[in-house]
A protein has these predicted regions:
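Short, solvent-exposed loop/turn segments that connect beta-strands within catalytic domains
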Residues: 63, 130-134, 148-153, 190-193, ...
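Non-catalytic protein-protein interaction segments used by genome-maintenance enzymes to assemble
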Residues: 121-179, 184-186
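Nuclease catalytic cores
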Residues: 17-62, 100
Length: 271
């Protein structure tokens, strides 16, 4: 049973990463539940791509899925986007037009030869208890599909739209941690063995050398037993940290929320 004194009800991948990166930003969003930090244009484009793929893998034909992603992008209000130096109406209009072009190019790269799957679930969400962990885990899986290496099992598929491909590939710690969150939730929801986490990265800008716009990384969970033990340790240690009285400090060097978290600290809004 969850300790009633803990400030949150569960851990998610985004929550844990925010806590490790910027404790004050984490406190604002996941404890106070204030969600007012604007998204970057790149982040909005990526979410539009996810919307398109969600509809495509739900059975809608390509053009219809692309249109629904574009509709999502156009419906995001200006105040939810961090336009940076584009402060005038004309500058923001120009930036939005560039976002639409970037989205249409990126989704065209993905759907030129879309990965084919026997899909069991799209945008699969859940919160589950895990033996040995002090808080439940929450995760959202882009796709849950029949595994091609074991037809009695499932694989988890994740899509990412990126400016550049990941350097550490499948062994990048942030991917491994995300995959374990998804593993536990999907295993509980589908009651089937979970074999792999498959990550498809799509580079949004056209490669000058003509190389492939898509890269595929595969995490076979059978090869990551040590990482599961490390994950459990990290969740327990992070939970211990938030269970004690503490001051939540900002991280001004955080490229995502450094300025905002420092402004909150300056104003003493969490005291």
């Amino acid at each position: 049973m969850r300790d009633a004194n803990l400030p949150i009800k569960h851990w998610s991948h985004s929550s844990l990463m925010t806590f490790l990166r910027n404790p004050l930003a984490w406190y604002k969003r996941y404890v106070e539940e204030v969600y007012d930090t604007p998204s970057s244009p790149s982040g909005v484009v990526g979410r539009a791509g996810h919307v398109a793929l969600q509809h495509f893998y739900s059975g809608i034909e390509k053009n219809g899925a692309v249109d629904l992603g574009l509709e999502y992008l156009r419906n995001v209000p200006d105040f939810e986007i961090n336009f940076g130096k584009a402060r005038t109406r004309a500058a923001r209009k120009k930036r939005r037009a560039a976002m639409e072009r970037e989205y249409l190019q990126a989704i065209s790269f993905y759907l030129a030869r879309p990965p084919r799957h026997d899909v069991f679930g799209v945008e699969v969400k859940g919160v589950v208890e895990v033996e040995g962990l002090p808080l439940p885990l929450k995760a959202v899986s882009d796709l849950v599909v029949r595994s091609k290496v074991d037809r009695k099992a499932v694989d988890i598929v994740d899509h990412k739209f990126v400016d550049s491909f990941s350097t550490l590939k499948k062994d990048k710690p942030i991917f491994v941690i995300q995959s374990i969150f998804n593993y536990y939730v999907v295993r509980e929801l589908f009651k089937k063995p979970v074999k792999r986490f498959i990550l498809h990265e799509c580079r949004k800008r056209k490669n000058a050398d003509g190389s492939a716009q898509m890269r595929r990384y595969v995490i076979d969970f059978a090869d990551y037993k040590e990482e599961f033990a490390l994950f459990h340790r990290l969740i327990r240690d992070a939970t211990a940290e938030i269970s004690r009285p503490r001051v939540y400090l900002p991280n001004p060097s955080d490229m995502f929320e450094g300025d905002n978290s420092f402004d909150i600290y300056r104003l003493g809004l969490t005291e």
